[in-house]
């Protein structure tokens, strides 16, 4: 399953942009 983004490099687009901070 995908990680949950706590910080993304594109706001609101965690699924199509890279996470800068993730938790599983």
Curated annotation (Swiss-Prot):
Expression induction or repression: By cadmium.
Residues that bind Cd(2+) 5: 8, 17
List of residues binding Cd(2+) 1: 3, 22
Record-listed Cd(2+) 6 binding positions: 10, 17
PTMs per UniProt: Contains 4 disulfide bonds.
GO molecular function, one term: metal chelating activity
Sequence similarity: Belongs to the metallothionein superfamily. Type 8 family.
Protein name (Swiss-Prot/TrEMBL): Metallothionein
Organism from which the protein derives: Neonectria lugdunensis (Aquatic fungus)
């Amino acid at each position: 399953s995908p990680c949950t983004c706590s910080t993304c490099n594109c706001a609101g687009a965690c699924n199509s942009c890279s996470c800068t901070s993730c938790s599983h």
